Curated annotation (Swiss-Prot):
The chain crosses the membrane at residues 155-175, 209-229, 528-548, 583-603, 619-639, 671-691, 695-715. This is Glucans biosynthesis glucosyltransferase H. Belongs to the glycosyltransferase 2 family. OpgH subfamily. It comes from Pectobacterium atrosepticum (strain SCRI 1043 / ATCC BAA-672). It comes from the Bacteria. GO terms for molecular function: hexosyltransferase activity.
Length: 854
């Protein structure tokens, strides 16, 4: 970039055919080759409507004149013949990235978690019953399935408690110290307290073991019966109460009921996000029902480079599919309440323009048939508030992700169908790949912060379970369409990335349990809060169970036994050990844990195993996944234990988006994260080997998994091993054997997007004419003239340019990007006076040119 020919260099950066570029050069007198004002005036000729000139407040605002012209040069096909371009009140060019706002009121109710206050208010008649929103016929239908659901859940409770009672009794009989025969209270009264403590210690340990065993076995038992009923449901193939059976599947969509597909994102993989979005859009278009849908990308990204890359990817998507006026993009400047706040903001501004909304995750892909089916189900069931699809995991290559994909694809349908069997219309909502009725969501599902102070107060982290509970509290059904195909998601590529996500989920579920006693919550959703807590609390309970079992073994081995407790006692009192009952209980527990997996494979065999690699390979995959789960279970146990403890201690939880792409774990990070587990495993194993080698064999699956945790974490994160399994047709899933067109298209568009990806987006927005025009037209801080605002703008631009680019903070960059005036002034200065800002020019010249296709 040369000062004397800066305008000519600028023209070379414009995406113009050679002939048009030459015409533009000829327009400029040689004396004006270094005058950016003349260049931008020449560019803007004919692009600004008469009487609609930019209100220029300073000499360096001249780049604002040519924003529209530069946009039309770069993305003319994405502007819908100029219909997507407009101007703000100061005449500056602005892209219509979002529709006109039609505000709706959405405010939360204060949480009332004190049961005594609730009881007092009920005595005063202050309880508000759910508003009736359905006809008498619909009420009869709902009462029918609610009665069936209640009966089923009582059966589940009875089966679980009965099974747990028997197992706990067995556990009691196999523990060595039966009854209190070895304790003589009168003797203990006259002996030192330390001796009494040693006599009581085995019984205290046994009691703790028994309580923990009962809780953990009850948790395992509930999962077993859920999977078993799901197996029977899928094997029979008919479900009288399946919500999917309420439509034929070819009904015309009601034109009065429009649907918004909304995708909240935050610092995600831009190329993958917009590839999946394009595949979903084209699939909807192929159904012939595109006019019923709009798409919203709702960004909470705070990385300036990613923000600019999102804007460019959105514009390219609109151009590629002709989606102008149907695909919208918004980036929030005030990130309030994370994802739930982002959705709430959409509902307040544009929600009342739609009857339904479908929530998508950044890695979600949905077929047009699935989306139109969800809309038909909503129209056929006017008392349904949320219908959750069952997303299938796919698209990953690492060994870890492929094991998880296989597990969720093979075992997941059993548990999802089982959940539906027990819950019916009072079910789960997982926060994505689900359709929501917008009006009741606005009226009932705004989330107030939890009252109080500490780590369990403030904004709700895991909003999905709470929103489902509030929807049901208002009288609307929450269903799982477990048998609806065409819904897909991706999983974290390695163990450490999954655990980052689990830490946030753990904290969120523990927070949600504060709502267990909130007024009006349905018992099923109180149980959902409880199961959410147990998903993570079971880890420290299991760890405590192992610690107490180890301590009991230490006491039993090292403490000198007393067989004669009284003078002249004829027969000794022996501690009891019944190995046959121990083996029976151990075998029963293994059956509860692994039978659902075997039933899943039996179901695959019954339905056809070809898409899983064949009957033999699917069985080998089962064994491989079981080995993998055995190795990882103790590792997750310790991590989840730390998460639970840290949540109670108030340690902060960062809002980090999970990694969405294949990513190998380096050895250094593995030893940092798993080093303490390796040491614990070694100490535990050596101690048990010295104490009693027989007990080490029982403990070996735990301790050796901990010792091997760094190795397993690293090698399972390798894509080479995962792809090797894929070539051997191991851990194969139907989406790989016969890929749906949506997933094929997603991979294709992902490769295309990577070819034209935008790196260092902020620097490109400062220098590149096309990217700068886009950033300026999409900036949202469009203030009227004010001297105070002008002073702030001048200060922001001056401070940024007087530093090196790498010294400008993210917050400063975001402030510059958010104002069309400041980003245009930056653009003008670096081109008008390149010698004054050599550090910026030098940085920019090292960057690859952005891919701009006119």
């Amino acid at each position: 970039m040369n000062k004397s020919t800066s305008s000519l260099d600028y023209i070379e950066k414009l995406p113009l055919p050679a002939e048009q570029a030459e015409v533009l050069r000829e327009k400029l007198p040689q004396a004006a080759w270094n005058d950016q004002a003349v260049l931008h005036q020449a560019l803007s000729e004919g692009s600004q409507p008469e009487g609609n000139q930019v209100n220029v407040q300073a000499e360096d605002d001249v780049a604002l004149h040519s924003v529209q012209a530069r946009l039309e040069m770069a993305w003319a096909d994405g502007l819908d013949n100029g219909k997507q371009l407009g101007t703000d009140r100061e005449g500056r060019a602005a892209l219509k990235a979002m529709p006109v706002i039609t505000r709706a009121s959405m405010f939360p109710d204060v949480w009332r978690t004190n049961p005594l206050i609730r009881w007092w208010e009920s005595l005063l008649g202050r309880t508000v019953p759910p508003r009736p929103h359905y006809s008498p016929e619909e009420k009869i239908s709902e009462n029918r399935w609610r009665l069936v659901g209640t009966i089923r859940r009582y059966i589940l409770l009875a089966l679980t408690l009965f099974q747990t009672a028997i197992a706990t009794w067995y556990m009691k009989t196999i523990l060595p110290y039966q009854g209190w025969a070895l304790i003589d209270p009168f003797e203990m009264a006259g002996q030192p307290w330390t001796r009494s403590l040693m006599q009581l210690l085995p019984y205290v340990l046994q009691s703790g073991i028994l309580v923990l065993f009962a809780v953990l076995f009850c948790w395992v038992s509930a999962g077993f019966w859920t999977a078993l009923m799901g197996f029977l449901q899928l094997l029979i193939g008919r479900d009288k109460y399946s919500i999917s059976s309420t439509t034929v599947g070819d009904e015309a969509l009601n034109p009065e009921h429009r649907t918004a597909l909304i995708m909240p994102i935050c610092n995600e993989d831009v190329e993958r996000v917009f590839a999946g979005l394009r595949a979903t859009y084209e699939s909807v278009e192929a159904t012939g029902n595109l006019e019923h849908f709009d798409i919203y990308v709702l960004s909470d990204s705070n990385d300036p480079d990613i923000c600019v890359a999102e804007q460019k990817a959105w514009m390219e998507l609109c151009r590629d599919v002709g989606g102008a006026g149907r695909i919208f993009y918004r980036r929030r400047r005030r990130r309030v309440k994370r994802k739930s706040g982002n959705i709430d903001d959409f509902c307040r501004r544009w929600g009342n323009q739609y009857s339904y909304m479908v929530i998508l995750d950044a890695d979600s892909v949905m077929s047009g048939e699935c989306l139109t089916s969800l809309v038909r189900l909503m129209e056929a069931n006017p008392n349904a508030g949320i219908i959750q699809s069952s997303p299938k995991a796919s698209g990953m290559d690492t060994l870890y992700a492929r094991c998880q994909q296989f597990a969720t694809r093979v075992y997941g349908p059993l548990f999802t169908a089982g959940l539906h069997f027990w819950q019916l219309g009072e079910s789960h909502y997982w926060g994505h790949n689900a359709i929501i009725r917008v009006k009741p969501f606005i009226e009932h599902c705004a989330l107030a912060p939890l009252p109080g102070e500490g780590s369990f107060a403030g904004a709700i982290l895991s909003h999905d379970f709470v929103e489902a509970a509030l929807m049901r509290r208002a009288g609307w059904g929450v269903w799982i369409a477990y048998d609806l195909p065409g819904s897909y998601e991706e999983l974290p590529p390695n163990l450490l990335d999954e655990l980052k996500r689990d830490r946030r989920w753990c904290h969120g579920n523990l927070m949600n349990f504060r709502l267990f006693l909130v007024k009006g919550m349905h018992p099923v959703h109180r149980a959902v809060f409880l199961t959410g807590v147990m998903s993570y609390l079971s880890a420290p309970l299991w760890f405590m169970f192992l610690v107490l079992s180890t301590a009991l073994q230490v006491v039993h081995t090292l403490m000198e036994p007393q067989y004669f407790l009284q003078p002249r006692q004829l027969f000794p009192v022996w501690p009891q050990w019944r190995p046959e009952l121990a083996i029976a209980l151990f075998s029963t527990t293994l059956v509860l844990l692994f039978l659902p997996k075997l039933l899943s494979v039996i179901l695959v065999w019954a339905k056809g195993a070809k898409e899983y690699g064949g009957a033999f390979r699917v069985f080998l995959s089962l064994l491989l996944e079981m080995l993998f789960s055995v190795l990882l279970a103790p590792v997750r146990m310790l991590f989840h234990t730390v998460f639970v403890v840290s949540a109670f201690l108030g340690w902060s939880v960062q809002w980090n988006s999970p990694q969405r792409d294949d990513d190998a774990t380096p050895w250094s990070e593995a030893f940092v994260r798993h080093g303490s587990q390796l040491i614990l495993g070694l100490v535990w194993a050596i101690g048990m080997a010295w104490l009693d080698l027989r007990f080490l064999w029982w403990l070996s699956p735990i301790v050796f998994s901990l010792i091997l945790s760094p190795v397993v974490s690293v090698y399972s994160s390798r894509a080479a091993l995962g792809l090797g399994c894929k070539r051997a047709k191991l851990l194969l899933i139907p989406e790989e054997f016969n890929p749906p067109r949506e997933l094929v298209a997603t991979d294709e568009y992902c490769r295309l997007n990577h070819q034209r990806r935008l790196d260092d987006g902020f620097m490109q927005a400062v220098f590149d004419p096309s990217v700068n025009a886009l950033a300026s037209a999409m900036a949202t801080a469009r203030h009227r003239f004010s001297r105070a605002i002008e002073d702030v703008r001048e200060q922001n631009v001056r401070e940024a340019l007087n530093r090196k680019p790498e010294e400008v903070s993210n917050n400063q960059r975001l402030a510059l990007l958010s104002d069309p005036v400041t980003i245009s002034r930056m653009h003008y200065h670096v081109w008008q006076k390149p010698e004054a800002y050599a550090a910026w020019v030098e940085f920019y010249q090292k960057l690859p040119a952005p891919h701009i296709k006119s």
